[in-house]
């Protein structure tokens, strides 16, 4: 009798866990999806644009009629993709995966795209990935038993495509690790490939100087951004969804805000920045304001680099004092460094023919100066 019961038990286990295509069956710690109509790579679950979400499988597209299989120019999982024909952070045209509640690491591999962002759970997760086959990784807590993700703008009028997803469970607790969120413009944002791009923002290089066992860095900066846009267009919303006590929000804006085409006065800039500071502090997190560095050519005839009157710097200094935030006067710190190395070497830290945007070495130097200043001030965690 005992042997018969044991045999029945084994058969039940086989029925429950036998289906490799059912992501819910064995509740693996890692889920890998290969999107598109091409051949499926080993170790991945193949997903076509027509695959509608099915509770019995535990994955699929919410509205497959708004998806399309497309080719991609890479190899392996990067050889094909799916295109999102409907998009937006609030769109229901999502790829859904049933997951036990907890904290997950999600690696996203795009198909062919000029510039696209990744959204999940109704907010941006990665901003403006560029180039064919671009890859990035982010942490996300799952609290309702399902991850809902899509690829979205990006650059209007271009294709938003997804080649592969790798989802890895980190913890049973649906809370992000301690995080430094970064806001800013093209001198701060990420460029792709992250580990080898010629151009870089200092937010991209920040992890080189941060203890990864203490913090993760989430860079939500984007090229061309102004304070009003960062607050109103979804980037601040994404930060406010997850930021918590013990986290930091590093914010550097002002360069594009001074451009007359944006019709943003210095007074408006200051009040929008103040509003963002207060919203973040209401979540129990700390704010670190940073003043933008100057141009490579801001040298006097005596060889002194100085740009203290650029980019609404005075308003940023005043805000730090009025709102009791931390401050990195990166404008002055970088000028002192540029003066020490001279005009020629300073120019070598910027993109060719461009006196505003740092190259990879320049962004690395700015990130190093920023973290050195935080350590000098004795700010917790640095």
Curated annotation (Swiss-Prot):
State the signal peptide span: 1-25
State its Enzyme Commission number(s).
3.1.-.-
Name of the protein in question: Uncharacterized esterase YxiM
Record-annotated active site: 186 (nucleophile), 354, 357
Recorded hits in InterPro entries, A to Z, give: AGA-YXIM_GBD, Galactose-bd-like_sf, RhgT-like, SGNH_hydro, SGNH_hydro_sf
A Pfam family the protein falls into = Lipase_GDSL_2
Keywords associated with the record: Hydrolase, Signal
Does the keyword field hold Chaperone? no
- Superkingdom of origin organism: Bacteria
User: Can the keyword Signal be found in this entry's annotation?
Assistant: yes
Organism annotation:
Bacillus subtilis (strain 168)
């Amino acid at each position: 009798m005992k042997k018969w019961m044991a045999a029945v038990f084994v058969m039940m286990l086989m029925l429950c866990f036998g289906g490799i295509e059912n992501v819910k069956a064995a509740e693996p710690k890692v889920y890998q999806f290969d999107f598109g109509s091409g051949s499926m790579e080993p170790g991945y679950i193949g997903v076509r644009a027509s695959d509608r979400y099915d509770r019995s499988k535990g994955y699929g597209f919410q509205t497959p009629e708004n998806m399309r299989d497309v080719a991609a120019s890479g190899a392996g999982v990067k050889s094909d993709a799916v295109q999102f024909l409907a998009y937006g952070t609030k769109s229901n045209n999502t790829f859904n995966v049933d997951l036990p509640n907890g904290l997950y690491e999600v690696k996203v591999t795009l198909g062919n795209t000029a510039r696209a962002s990744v959204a999940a759970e109704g907010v941006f997760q990665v901003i403006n990935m560029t180039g064919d086959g671009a890859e990035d990784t982010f942490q996300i807590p799952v609290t309702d038993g399902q991850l809902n993700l899509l690829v979205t703008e990006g650059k209007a009028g271009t294709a938003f495509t997804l080649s592969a997803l790798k989802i890895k469970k980190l913890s049973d607790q649906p809370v992000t690790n301690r995080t430094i969120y970064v806001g800013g413009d093209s001198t701060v944002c990420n460029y792709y490939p992250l580990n080898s791009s010629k151009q870089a923002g200092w937010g991209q290089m920040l992890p080189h100087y941060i203890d990864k066992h203490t913090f993760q860095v989430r860079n939500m900066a984007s090229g061309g951004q102004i304070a009003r846009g960062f607050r109103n267009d979804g980037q601040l919303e994404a930060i406010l969804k997850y930021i918590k006590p013990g986290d930091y929000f590093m914010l550097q804006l002002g360069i594009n805000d001074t451009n007359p085409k944006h019709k943003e006065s210095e007074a408006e800039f200051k009040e929008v920045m103040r509003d963002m500071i207060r919203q973040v502090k209401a979540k129990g997190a700390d704010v670190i304001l940073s003043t933008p560095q100057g141009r490579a050519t801001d040298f006097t005839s005596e060889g002194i680099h100085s740009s203290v009157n650029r980019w609404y710097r005075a308003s940023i200094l005043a805000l730090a004092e009025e709102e009791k935030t931390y401050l990195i006067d990166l404008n002055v710190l970088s000028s002192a460094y540029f003066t020490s190395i001279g005009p020629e070497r300073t120019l070598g830290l910027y993109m060719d023919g461009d006196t505003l945007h740092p190259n990879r070495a320049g962004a690395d130097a700015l990130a190093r100066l920023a973290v050195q200043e935080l350590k000098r001030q004795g700010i917790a965690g640095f």
